[in-house]
């Protein structure tokens, strides 16, 4: 279309770009601005209340997330049979629905990460500084430990005998399968986060951010449906760490590396895919 | 274009949308544009993720050892519908978020995409589907092979004709929803906020799965059926494969005709029969 500003100014793009018709909106001009990359290290943040407020928000969100989800898992495990509980699908809904609610609540405070893998992916895309990324990850892990701790406090005996909601590779699957499932699952989640928070996306939604959390929550729900039989679904290192620390059994720790390596690789791949292939940011001319 | 838009606004007070011009049948210029290849990559990745999550959910469910141990058929339907919602949301601005050769075919018939783009999308979708199911087989090899490979087949007790009919009507529901969600007039009514376009599309997929999982496992997406058949490579899956191409394409054709000729009355508009102003 005439006059439409091109995303990529490279030699191959000599022809005007046609707007792909499908579910795309027909925008005539660019009414969004790509935010500048965040500085790598920003000591000034440490003196701002909003920095600590964001960390506290991540702590509380992850605490509530682990409390609701692990308690749901415990309810399913202790039931006499699966039909008497909310079942595997109910567990998936607990994870996905809780992410939807919490991302909605904390999006404006901290960006609503609730997941070290999401924080890592956004850090790689230079959406936040190293200082903030590390602070968020620490607060998320602490929140997860406290959330799982409260669940154990409610029912210490049942908690220990029913697996503690910890992530382990299930019988019949190799560690390689578990790792692969975590990588692809986290890719789905972080890629959805990138799409939902993209500046261009906001412009297309006429800057109405009401539904960004919904696809993120759905992505978590869907990945849980797919991989609960394999690993109980980590795709969130804080969630896996919180349950592992409070449960504290050998087999939970044996597999624990999978739930950090897998999610971080998946997040890195999603960051690469979105920033380089979809948005082609490194190839844009600096205007 | 901007001049044309403002002119249109002047002469047609009250109508604040413009129907896009029909896409050219052959547009070789697209082949030299990065956004074309980016769209293909996006369709490939989206279909890969779609097949991985959905087929893994199917295999995980079938692996259950007792009643209610899996996510249930409802969970499988959610996996399909929810994944379409998420992926259409993510790729809408890149490629239009088709993730389904039947949707691409319907939009091609409605002249929303060129032939070159339509063929490119379909190939990317089929390749993505094969890779997605390949991931599932790699991660859960033994249960994948013993539990039907997530392939679409006609269930016992149903004839091929019944299955074909189910696929036709199911795909009609999906493609008709896609047309409604992407209609420029619809956008105008929604104040041009396309926030919810992916949601009804995802729900349409979800509800069709609720209805037809017992009949065929629900194809309504030739790439999905093709990917599972290729990786599972079982005779029965191939015997029935034609149903999962003919049915969806007929359904898409019916939806395109219904939306374009009856709801939007584009043929009648072209004739100018009902209005003196030929530019309407």
From Swiss-Prot, chain A:
Q: What is the protein's major site of localization?
A: membrane
Q: Which NCBIfam families match?
A: MIP (TIGR00861)
Pfam families listed in its UniProt record: MIP
Please indicate the ranges of residues that lie on the Extracellular side. Answer: 77-92, 155-175, 231-257
What's in the domain note?
Aquaporins contain two tandem repeats each containing three membrane-spanning domains and a pore-forming loop with the signature motif Asn-Pro-Ala (NPA).
Q: Which residues carry this modification: N-acetylmethionine?
A: 1
Region Disordered: start and end of each range?
Answer: 1-34
Q: What would be one Gene Ontology cellular-component term for the protein?
A: cytosol
Subcellular localization is given as: Cell membrane
Name positions with the PTM Phosphoserine.
Answer: 285
Family membership noted in the UniProt record: Belongs to the MIP/aquaporin (TC 1.A.8) family. PIP (TC 1.A.8.11) subfamily.
Membrane topology per the record? Answer: Multi-pass membrane protein
> Which gene is the coding source of this polypeptide chain?
PIP1-5
Q: Which CDD domains match?
A: MIP (cd00333)
Recorded GO MF terms: water channel activity
Entry keywords, A to Z: Acetylation, Cell membrane, Membrane, Phosphoprotein, Repeat, Transmembrane, Transmembrane helix, Transport
Summary of the tissues where the protein is detected: Predominantly expressed in green siliques. Also expressed above ground, in roots and flower buds.
- Residue ranges crossing the lipid bilayer per the database entry: 56-76, 93-113, 134-154, 176-196, 210-230, 258-278
Whether Transferase counts among this entry's keywords is no
Find motif (NPA 2) and give its ranges: 236-238
Function statement: Aquaporins facilitate the transport of water and small neutral solutes across cell membranes.
Know the name of this protein?
Probable aquaporin PIP1-5
Which residue stretches are annotated as topological domain Cytoplasmic? 1-55, 114-133, 197-209, 279-287
In chain numbering, motif NPA 1 lies across: 115-117
Q: Which Gene3D superfamilies does the UniProt record give?
A: Glycerol uptake facilitator protein
Swiss-Prot record, chain B:
Q: Which organism is it from?
A: Arabidopsis thaliana
Domains: what does the record tell us?
A: Aquaporins contain two tandem repeats each containing three membrane-spanning domains and a pore-forming loop with the signature motif Asn-Pro-Ala (NPA).
> Which NCBIfam families does the record associate with it?
MIP
Q: Return any one Pfam family short name.
A: MIP
Q: What is this protein called?
A: Aquaporin PIP2-7
Residues that bear N-acetylmethionine: 1
According to the UniProt topology, which residue ranges lie Cytoplasmic? 1-38, 91-118, 182-192, 264-280
Functional description taken from the UniProt entry: Water channel required to facilitate the transport of water across cell membrane. May be involved in the osmoregulation in plants under high osmotic stress such as under a high salt condition.
**Residues annotated as transmembrane:** 39-59, 70-90, 119-139, 161-181, 193-213, 243-263
Q: Which GO terms describe its cellular component?
A: plasma membrane; plasmodesma; vacuole
Keywords recorded for this protein, A-Z: Acetylation, Cell membrane, Membrane, Methylation, Phosphoprotein, Repeat, Transmembrane, Transmembrane helix, Transport
Residue numbers of N6,N6-dimethyllysine PTMs: 3
The annotated subunit structure for this chain is: Interacts with SYP61 and SYP121 in trafficking vesicles and at the plasma membrane.
Q: Motif NPA 1: which residue numbers?
A: 100-102
Q: What does the organism's lineage look like at the top? A: Eukaryota, Viridiplantae, Streptophyta, Embryophyta, Tracheophyta
Could you tell me the gene encoding this protein?
PIP2-7
Phosphothreonine: residues carrying this PTM: 279
Specify the protein's topology with respect to the membrane.
Answer: Multi-pass membrane protein
Q: Where is this motif: NPA 2?
A: 221-223
> Which segments sit on the Extracellular face?
60-69, 140-160, 214-242
Q: Which residues carry this modification: Phosphoserine?
A: 273, 276
Primary residence: membrane
Induction: what does the entry report?
Answer: By NaCl and abscisic acid (ABA) treatments.
């Amino acid at each position: 279309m005439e006059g439409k500003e091109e995303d990529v100014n490279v030699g191959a793009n000599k022809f005007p770009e046609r707007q792909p018709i499908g579910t795309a909106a027909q925008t005539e001009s660019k009414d969004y601005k790509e935010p500048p990359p965040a500085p790598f290290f920003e000591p000034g943040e440490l003196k701002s209340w909003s920095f600590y407020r964001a960390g506290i928000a991540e702590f509380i969100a992850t605490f509530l997330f682990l409390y609701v989800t692990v308690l749901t898992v415990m309810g399913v495990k202790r039931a006499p049979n699966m039909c008497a509980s909310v079942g595997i699908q109910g567990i998936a809904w607990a994870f996905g629905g809780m992410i939807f609610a919490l991302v909605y609540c904390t999006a404006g405070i901290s960006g609503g990460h609730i997941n070290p893998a999401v924080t890592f992916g956004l850090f790689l895309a230079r959406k936040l500084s190293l200082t903030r990324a590390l602070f968020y990850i620490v607060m998320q892990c602490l929140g997860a430990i406290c959330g799982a701790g409260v669940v154990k406090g409610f029912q210490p005996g049942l908690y220990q005998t029913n697996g503690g909601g910890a992530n382990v590779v299930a019988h019949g699957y190799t560690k390689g399968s578990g790792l692969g499932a975590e990588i692809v699952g986290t890719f789905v989640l972080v890629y959805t986060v990138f799409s939902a928070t993209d500046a261009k996306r906001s412009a297309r939604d006429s800057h109405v951010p009401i539904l960004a959390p919904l696809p993120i929550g759905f992505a978590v729900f869907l990945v849980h449906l797919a991989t609960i039989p394999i690993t109980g679904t980590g795709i969130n290192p804080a969630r896996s760490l919180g349950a592992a620390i409070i449960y504290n059994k050998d087999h939970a720790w044996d597999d624990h590396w999978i739930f950090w390596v897998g999610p971080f690789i998946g997040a890195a791949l999603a960051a690469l895919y979105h920033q380089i292939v979809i948005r082609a940011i490194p190839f844009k001319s600096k205007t | 274009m901007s001049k044309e838009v403002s002119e249109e606004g002047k002469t047609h007070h009250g109508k604040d949308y413009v129907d896009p011009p029909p896409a050219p049948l052959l547009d070789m210029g697209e082949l030299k544009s990065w956004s074309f290849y980016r769209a293909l990559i996006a369709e490939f990745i989206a279909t890969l993720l779609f097949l991985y999550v959905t087929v893994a959910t199917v295999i995980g469910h079938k692996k259950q050892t007792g009643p209610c141990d899996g996510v249930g058929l409802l969970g499988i339907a959610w996996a399909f519908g929810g994944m379409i919602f998420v992926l259409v949301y993510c790729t809408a601005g890149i490629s239009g978020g088709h993730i389904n050769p039947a949707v691409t075919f319907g939009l091609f018939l409605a002249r929303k995409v060129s032939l070159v783009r339509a063929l490119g999308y379909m190939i990317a979708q089929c390749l993505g589907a094969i890779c997605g199911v390949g991931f599932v087989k790699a991660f859960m090899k033994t249960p994948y092979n013993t539990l039907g490979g997530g392939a679409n087949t006609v269930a016992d007790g149903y004839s091929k004709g019944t299955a074909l009919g189910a696929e036709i009507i199911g795909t009609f529901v999906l493609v008709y929803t896609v047309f409604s969600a992407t209609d420029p007039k619809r956008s105008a009514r929604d104040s041009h906020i396309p926030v919810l376009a992916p949601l009804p599309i995802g729900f349409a997929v979800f509800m069709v799965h609720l209805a037809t999982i017992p009949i065929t496992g629900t194809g309504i997406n030739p790439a999905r059926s093709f990917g599972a058949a290729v990786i599972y490579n079982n005779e029965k899956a191939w015997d029935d494969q034609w149903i999962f191409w003919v049915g969806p394409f007929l359904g898409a054709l019916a939806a395109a005709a219904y939306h374009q000729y009856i709801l939007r009355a584009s043929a009648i508009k072209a004739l100018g029969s009902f209005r003196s102003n030929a530019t309407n």
